[in-house]
């Protein structure tokens, strides 16, 4: 039998009656192997400084047991019953925690209360710099911060955890509690602890009434990651969980960026000897990720208080661990090391308290208007190099493939050179750059990359960043169940399959999405889909294996915006029919898999294929379309740059009436106007991306609508000027301008026509103006 990593024989001070435990589990734990499945094996985890934790194994089944320590304990500490109940609530809500199986309050079984949970197989990283993994994965792992944001977004009532905490005043109680517990455990006087406690008590944040479910000890070595992927499987150690201010968790999770250089050891390894690098997100980037996920501003007042509180708390924990060591009741072998940590931790807390504020966005001294992360700069440079070395040279071969197969079924397949480029990009880590959870890039970072890929229409697919797959992957990432992610998101992320999105319908005015007629009706353990869709981009690709379909679910009592749902439909499901490809200004657009009319006739899929729940379709659509519209716009700006380049080359090569075209003032003015249009469009798009990063999708709705109107108009103007300078050649197959124009023109209709976005802009503008007026509009 393989030994569980990180375990040892049960330490003498934590031994208990294993026979009694085995008999109890045989009686009370469903599924626990009965005799004669072999003896129960018990080993103790070497990590963990609080509640002793044990690995149980019998008959091929593995469990984890957490118990109270023996002997005298600090007041109100080691509440394993609270750990069990909060994990049970979170597991039921789909949050990544080990499944809690059983709680035992009968101290006669093993001498203390305990609970048992399912063992989760995965990786735990004890060193925050993650030396065990490669650079690309290392940065993605830090997006465990998304998991923290998810935790803080839960409604306590929906979890059934009303009364779990003690109500408003969390920060005040924390200062008081940790001061009291430190005083009870102190073995010597440390002036810095007293001074820090006094400062915290006198500088409580004004919003101390904010309440969310918080973990209390959220850090990377309390997280189990997937064995091979950068994915969180379980968050551990809920002993300190309660309801309180979420920024306390955020500060605690990011405190290692400020860790005292004199402290290289915390139990095991150089856990906090860490600074941000190109591969590791900076403190500012982690804060930005968290704020983006929660939809809050990245300007965080009082962050110095929460960081100082984190160090005060760490000092108190360290003192408590050492106190248990002195009485022979420590949970870990390295507990004696903690005595020397209290003073440096307190001093660091005092240092942080003197910082007036922390901003998640660093002030840029390079002259750039928008902040681009270090990793964003690095990836953008790599993408530019890849485009120059591999993508541009492949353009001719790809064009020849589609010209050769334009009237055959081969046109729906991908050119071999494109598949080779995809493998090369994937090998270089230039893959799935659009998804923050994978790339660690902000929307602003990706906006600049999307512009670069937009310079060639086939380039986004090289990096697995093509629509509609990007939007579908975002939907599954944000709203899909673990089962849905495993079956569909993972192969999409790997580039093994493609997808289509079915929303627009031929028989209704789709600019008002509530007109939708496609029905999704519950029938036992299935949903039945009936309806017609068109402009389903990518459906002609032979590799298109799944569609996300939006339709109406029967709920007459709900508002008109809560009657629609999104559901996953495998393309090989009986009743799914591809009717015809739709042309765009005469182009079939084979390179993007075409734009198909698709009919769904009595299509039956399992209930588990519903995304997020009935009536949540518009909610999902808004989450999907916000960033997606920005991605389209930035790619369009890349196309505009290509068109302007063609314009200038033509103007420099051709002569009329005895002089170069660019010497004609009208052409020179066109060139200038095109540059103005591109720069204006880019600035608005980057502002919108930055606002999504800092305030979230909802707060950026006005800017998203403005960008969606402005950019296609500006780009069409540039392409039209380029066509005019090129003359007849500009509308021929010898130049990409005609197909560019056709594609960009569709963006004034796709993802909502200009008129819908203009109405949105006007509505938000009136609301903004009304705040400035005394009379209500």
From Swiss-Prot:
Name of the protein this chain belongs to: Acyl-CoA dehydrogenase family member 11
Source organism phylogeny: Eukaryota, Metazoa, Chordata, Craniata, Vertebrata
Entry annotated with the keyword Magnesium: no
Binding site for substrate: 511, 626-629, 752
Gene it is expressed from: ACAD11
UniProt catalytic activity: a 2,3-saturated acyl-CoA + oxidized [electron-transfer flavoprotein] + H(+) = a (2E)-enoyl-CoA + reduced [electron-transfer flavoprotein]; docosanoyl-CoA + oxidized [electron-transfer flavoprotein] + H(+) = (2E)-docosenoyl-CoA + reduced [electron-transfer flavoprotein]; tetracosanoyl-CoA + oxidized [electron-transfer flavoprotein] + H(+) = (2E)-tetracosenoyl-CoA + reduced [electron-transfer flavoprotein]; eicosanoyl-CoA + oxidized [electron-transfer flavoprotein] + H(+) = (2E)-eicosenoyl-CoA + reduced [electron-transfer flavoprotein]
Tagged with keyword Electron transport: no
Positions bound to FAD: 501-511, 535-537, 654, 724-728, 753-755
E.C. no: 1.3.8.-
Organism: Gallus gallus
